[in-house]
Amino acid sequence: MGKLLRKPLNERIAPGVTLVQDINQANSPLSYVGFRLIEMEKGAIYQEELTELECCIVALTGKITVSEGNDIFPEIGTRANVFEKIPTDSVFISGGRAFQVKADTEKARVALCYSPANQDLPTTLIKASDNSIEQRGKYQNKRLVHNILPDVSEVASSLLVVEVYTNGGNFSSYPPHKHDRDNLPAESLLEESYYHEINPEQGFIFQRVYTDERTLDETMAVEHQNAVIVPEGYHPVGVPDGYDSYYLNVMAGPNRVWKFHNDPDHEWILERD
């Protein structure tokens, strides 16, 4: 299956551009999902030509200018730190196009989320105000969700992107759920990646990835700027007291529908008053 936990690479790939995470088909068990995290210094430029993939560029922190053809989106981005817990701006770019990202602030952190380009779609600015915001769960199962590219959006052809905040002492992606069977309308097949940040940064969270048969069963202590790959199975997250969790999810599969199946052993928690 390969290693599911990915530590930061911190490789300089261009002047002022550091590659922190790089998940793709060649270095992972994933067939649909790709993910890159780059950190940029002011004035630095990152360029990429997409072929068969579409991409959502998320301005995690700082301000950036994104250019594709005649489309230029100047100084997008809304926060200096993800733990401001406000939505941010993103840009969707379809396959077969080239784009450029330029850092406009002293530092910028940018997520690049990839999946197969099944249609030729317009380059689109997804404003922070376009994000739908949800408060999910109760008891010690509360989380704040920013939907960047939900399955109801028609901006992308296969890509799903969401941000999730979980306070200390809470669980998220819980009760454990999975989406690894192409069995609609009961369940959809979606691979997933998690990019994690933790506040304060010296903290850690726990994430378990497991299947019903336990042919895959891996529990990880996940630190700041680690990534976790979820090719299949349930994938709950637990956050220790005193620390807050942020993660960015990228999902994709044969159908752009998020339909999950809860672990029946733990679904009872949803039935509480």
Swiss-Prot record:
One of its GO terms (molecular function) is 5-deoxy-D-glucuronate isomerase activity. It catalyses: 5-deoxy-D-glucuronate = 5-dehydro-2-deoxy-D-gluconate. Its EC number is 5.3.1.30. It is an enzyme of class 5 (isomerase). Pathway: Polyol metabolism; myo-inositol degradation into acetyl-CoA; acetyl-CoA from myo-inositol: step 4/7. It comes from the Bacteria. GO terms for biological process: inositol catabolic process. InterPro entries: Deoxy-glucuronate_isom_IolB, IolB_Bacilli, KduI/IolB_isomerase, RmlC-like_jellyroll, RmlC_Cupin_sf. Disulfide bonds: none annotated. Belongs to the isomerase IolB family. This is 5-deoxy-glucuronate isomerase.
